[in-house]
Amino acid sequence: MDMKKLIERINFLYKKSKEEGLTEEEKVEQQKLRREYIDIIKGNVKVQLEGVEKIPTANRKN
């Protein structure tokens, strides 16, 4: 599932939970989607951090 659709579905389930409640299946789906979203974000942060290169203090420009 692409990120936009994932977020849309998470938001839909959140709004539905506040307005009328969720079925047990929807609650399970909501938790699964939230976990998938968090895992994607963690992966993106990890990739970004792995690409960071430390510059020695002597080579920095102020």
UniProtKB/Swiss-Prot annotation:
Keyword Chloroplast set for record: no
Compartments (UniProt record): Cytoplasm
Source species, domain of life: Bacteria
Keyword Ribonucleoprotein: no
Record-linked Pfam families: DUF896
GO cellular component: cytoplasm
Keyword line: Cytoplasm
SUPFAM superfamilies per UniProt: YnzC-like (SSF158221)
Family membership: Belongs to the UPF0291 family.
HAMAP family, alphabetized: UPF0291 (MF_01103)
Name listed for the protein in its UniProt record: UPF0291 protein CLI_2672
Organism: Clostridium botulinum (strain Langeland / NCTC 10281 / Type F)
